[in-house]
């Protein structure tokens, strides 16, 4: 949606456009691992739509589409607001793929936005803290093993990022970095 709006704006499309999204911020998903590692800031990886839209003909509307009336050419939001259109572009986004791996949905963090990256960072740091304080080798091994579901570009990038980050974080807790395992499924 954002790319379409910006492209039309750059081509000087003369008609008013509405970009409707349920989130306030756009997510550069391939860069979420950079937010996790603090190599980039929240605003770089997860900027507000309003900051990206420097175009007089595009208006950002935060909301969730409840219905589309094709006959009336109207988009209705769950807030009760509705918007008329002459042309409609639907961009529905994506969903996480767990590749049929049992338990993956329930036992993993989906990395979909900045909040997910922050939650994952906090979770990993808490596990490292726990591991540094336990003398039980088996429990420590469990705490220091991270599995990544998905061996595509994002999964491999995440594995590489965690392979760098976790030892840095664990070293600060005086932990043995050789005990850390990052596994890609």
Locate the predicted segments by residue.
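Beta1-alpha1 glycine-rich phosphate/pyrophosphate-binding loop at the start
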Residues: 1-62, 66-67, 147, 153-185
